[in-house]
């Protein structure tokens, strides 16, 4: 069964792969391009959420989605994710 976390991370991974980017690129974007220990910690946190296929906190989701908007102005992933979020809220 696909969970909201699976759906979110599968779509994030696909968009990053299509654009030759990685989670480290996302972490650098979220930290304004500063490559320091905090950026590495953020990358580790994102990677752990991805590996465990769980949803990160909303502030991290917003950062990831803002980064992905660079590649897809319509950002279909946010539509899919919001559908799952509504489903989770109802159940």
Describe the function of each predicted region.
Residues 1-33:
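A short, Lys/Arg-rich alpha-helix, primarily the initiator
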Residues 4, 8, 22, 42-45, ...:
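N-terminal positioning helix adjacent to the helix-turn-helix/winged-helix DNA-binding module
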Residues 13, 24-28, 44, 62, ...:
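Residues within the helices of the helix-turn-helix
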Residues 29-32, 49, 67-70:
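A short, basic/aromatic helix-end/turn motif that makes direct DNA contacts
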Residues 32-56:
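Recognition helix of helix-turn-helix/homeodomain-like DNA-binding domains
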Residues 57-78:
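DNA major-groove recognition helix of helix-turn-helix/homeodomain DNA-binding modules
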């Amino acid at each position: 069964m696909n969970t909201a976390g699976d759906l979110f991370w599968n779509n994030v991974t696909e968009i990053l792969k299509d654009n030759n980017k990685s989670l480290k690129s996302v972490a650098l974007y979220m930290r304004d391009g500063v490559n320091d220990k905090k950026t590495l910690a953020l990358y580790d946190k994102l990677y752990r959420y991805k590996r465990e296929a769980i949803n990160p906190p909303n502030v991290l989701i917003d950062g990831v989605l803002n980064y992905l908007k660079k590649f897809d102005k319509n950002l279909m992933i946010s539509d899919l994710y919001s559908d799952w979020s509504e489903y989770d809220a109802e159940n």
